[in-house]
Amino acid sequence: MTGAQRWVVKIGSALLTADGKGLDRNAMGVWVEQMAALHEAGVELVLVSSGAVAAGMSRLGWTARPSAMHELQAAAAIGQMGLVQAWESSFAEHGRHTAQILLTHDDLSDRKRYLNARSTLRTLVELGVVPVINENDTVVTDEIRFGDNDTLAALVANLVEADLLVILTDRDGMFDADPRNNPEAQLIYEARADDPALDAVAGGTGGALGRGGMQTKLRAARLAARSGAHTVIVGGRIERVLARLKGGERLGTLLSPERGMLAARKQWLAGHLQTRGTLVLDDGAVAALAKDQKSLLPVGVKLVQGSFRRGEMVVCVASDGREIARGLSNYSAIEAQKIIGHSSESIVRELGYMAEPELIHRDNLILV
């Protein structure tokens, strides 16, 4: 993990609370100390934090996790306040700024909102801010019961194109048998995320405060692998676990993707999106895409055809109609009509704002 420069770190409820008696500020301080050290070493960091419901339960004096939706949502709303304040104050002690982001799965399934969230997160990371992400439990419906922050963390890893997803849990990793029942159980140090043999050993459920058992963690690793991210499922009670992972120590279970990041992303783009429009390119843009594999700039587009929204797939063709590439447009068809033929520096003048300097970024282009 020494070469991974963008990490998504997910910390479960059991590691942030004092045996269900509210947030453990000392434990959170230890986590922040480790994450601040990673930051100092040049790692771009996104934190997915559980604990809001558990913190709210403690404030309300509840000892058992309620099953009623409205009670869970009330606990989440109350606990989120203290959770964010605790992270903010702890990171401030190390000179680090934080930003709160509450997401639902709908935010990441709607392409326009997905792109907006991605732009915001990338900007925060580039500013050296640590985004603190949680599921917006107070407004979702069945997600609060069936959703989990392991899955959210994997989707965030896809969103920010992370190199590494670290899922910190109260177990040391994945075992070939349940270590609570079998003293001969062996830790699985490394495997492919898509290995079907892992399904048989990922049984069990989460604890009383959390929602995610090992099955959800395996599913999260497979989601993260779609964009080429590695996942480490590792015990959060291991001393200096993040620093030791950064140093290359073999801890927990490393689940690797089948393909590299770019190849996985290209396959996802090619296989899962329908085209919504066409961009007719000039000869210079055709050469820039086909030979130099550069991004598509507005200046190289002659004509916009069809109706598409920001984030939808469009076909890029040469003047003679030959298909050159496909990609995700950073602008809608209406916006693209206004900026084609102009330099990137002119986008603000034409639209009044600039979402991205490219019409299609090269990472979102597939040559055909």
UniProtKB/Swiss-Prot annotation:
It is an enzyme of class 2 (transferase). PROSITE patterns: GLUTAMATE_5_KINASE, PUA. One of its GO terms (cellular component) is cytosol. GO terms for biological process: L-proline biosynthetic process. Its EC number is 2.7.2.11. GO terms for molecular function: ATP binding; glutamate 5-kinase activity; RNA binding. Substrate binds at residues 50, 137, 149. It is found in: Cytoplasm. The keyword Transferase applies. InterPro entries: AceGlu_kinase-like_sf (IPR036393), Asp/Glu/Uridylate_kinase (IPR001048), G5K_ProB (IPR041739), Glu/AcGlu_kinase (IPR001057), Glu_5kinase (IPR011529), Glu_5kinase/COase_Synthase (IPR005715), Glutamate_5-kinase_CS (IPR019797), PUA (IPR002478). Pathway: Amino-acid biosynthesis; L-proline biosynthesis; L-glutamate 5-semialdehyde from L-glutamate: step 1/2. It comes from the Bacteria. Pfam families: AA_kinase, PUA. Keywords: Amino-acid biosynthesis, ATP-binding, Cytoplasm, Kinase, Nucleotide-binding, Proline biosynthesis, Transferase. Residues 276-354 form the PUA domain. It catalyses: L-glutamate + ATP = L-glutamyl 5-phosphate + ADP. ATP binds at residues 10, 169-170. SUPFAM superfamilies: Carbamate kinase-like, PUA domain-like. Catalyzes the transfer of a phosphate group to glutamate to form L-glutamate 5-phosphate. Belongs to the glutamate 5-kinase family. This is Glutamate 5-kinase. It comes from Pseudomonas savastanoi pv. phaseolicola (strain 1448A / Race 6). The lineage of its organism: Bacteria, Pseudomonadati, Pseudomonadota, Gammaproteobacteria, Pseudomonadales.
